[in-house]
Amino acid sequence: MSRATRAALAGLLGALALGAAAPAGASAEAAAGQAGSAATAGTASAGAPGAVTDLLRQPRVAGEGRLRWFGLQIYDARLFVTPDGVDIERWTRTPFALELRYARKLLGEDIAQASLKEMARMGFGTEAQRAGWLDTMRRLFPDVSAGDRLTGVHLPEGRAVFYRNDTRIGRVEDRQFVEAFFAIWLDPRTVAPDLRRSLLADPAAAARAGASPR
């Protein structure tokens, strides 16, 4: 694999790996088409991991999807919610967990950098805040290999707890950071709208919000 190809792949792997950014030279719209084309509607599946059951009440799968890029499988994503579901219009007030199971190796630095790019693209934070967020993500996110899971648990009051597999790797209490981070997947402005629809596929959850997944 050439250096340019590795750089582009790292951009998209960080792209929605724990952060979303278009590959070098591609527009956000083009990245959405490449990534979202293989996202599939989620259905309830295997039980929630311990990292989720410890923090969420009776967690269940609201939706799941697979991210591919030019035929390469990047990761499988699952969104766990409580019996109350997720309020699509006000998800920042809702407890949930996002689990990503990787299909290939990715550096933690790529995850942090790509996440920051997407937060900035959507207009979250000042330049000074984002510099602090990058430091936080560099401390949080490890390198991952095929089969590894990274899970972010979103809690009320602007808190989040992160796990690698079932080992806790950090906690953040910064409402603006937490909203900006999970917006990468759940905000309507995401570069992978098909994956968002898959994660929010549970019709009962949508009905509770008084809206349907976009």
Regions found by a protein language model. Name each.
Residues M1-G11:
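Bacterial N-terminal signal peptides that target proteins for export
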Residues A4-T5, A17, S27:
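Short linear motifs in low-complexity or flexible loops
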Residues A10-A20:
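Bacterial N-terminal signal peptides
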Residues G25-R214:
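Terminal leader/tail segments of proteins
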